[in-house]
């Protein structure tokens, strides 16, 4: 029985010695290069993540290309929808351009009519300046101008008579008061 016990006890001693050697070796390796190993592991993890994302995107692109190759009807429908959208947008743009042109034509017509009226009023000897400030009310949908009475100068008496103006010193008698100069009147300090 001693023989059976001897190989068993020798074997664990050998295993513990190899474990101790492994522990010492790994410990000294980590003590010397631990930070380098840690940073290289982190960097390797980041690189693997980036590469996996790119591989997924590449596979997705390949699948999309395969679908478009297999289904040309889908491509044709997309192109037709795109062409229809472009045509609609162009029609809207053309309609806006036509509205703008019509507006410009109306403005030019209005200017031309005002110039003709100004010329006619100059030929008749009237002043043309009074009509230039107000818009033409004949064409507008507003109230009729025949019911509006123009305001003239009223016959009211002014509140203050005599033409006295306290800000300028004009009027109000023979003398005019002026305020004195600022500062000491003697011109210096004591």
Swiss-Prot record:
InterPro entries xrefs: Selenoprotein_S
Cell location: Endoplasmic reticulum membrane; Cytoplasm
Topology in membrane: Single-pass membrane protein
Main location: endoplasmic reticulum
GO cellular component: cytoplasmic microtubule; Derlin-1 retrotranslocation complex; Derlin-1-VIMP complex; low-density lipoprotein particle; very-low-density lipoprotein particle
Transmembrane feature ranges: 28-48
Ranges of biased composition (kind: Gly residues): 160-174
Gene Ontology molecular function terms on file: antioxidant activity; ATPase binding; ubiquitin-specific protease binding
Protein family per UniProt: Belongs to the selenoprotein S family.
Name listed for the protein in its UniProt record: Selenoprotein S
